[in-house]
């Protein structure tokens, strides 16, 4: 892996799959305050083949927002949710279209103190509704609607 990339978290998923989240700073597009942030989630099969790598670049968070969410999957393997969240967000939940609520683990990094990273892999057949960020006290701070992402994914898979 490129030496500028920082591994944020890694783990395993069913079927012998492994995953990792990485991030790195990249030169900005001429902004005076410098760098942009790229973050990705990579899913690897037991033979070491990359099944999926997705995420995004740009500013760590857009002005006025507390979350930047990306989702996706490849032709095989689970569906991935990766979010960059403001440090005020202490807990993240994923809600399915059926109303089931799942905890999305949140990971910090000393290298990227302006954001934390939340990620979860779920079965690709699952229909999702939203990702919600909460304060330490449980107050809902921001909700990201997944309807567009899900409609596109399930129509084109």
Question: What is each stretch, according to the model?
Answer:
Residues 76-78, 88-157:
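Ser/Thr-rich low-complexity repeats and stalk/linker segments
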Residues 80-84:
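Short, well-ordered beta-strand segments enriched in hydrophobic/aromatic residues
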Residues 1-79, 97, 142-143, 147-152:
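Solvent-exposed, non-transmembrane segments of extracytoplasmic/periplasmic domains
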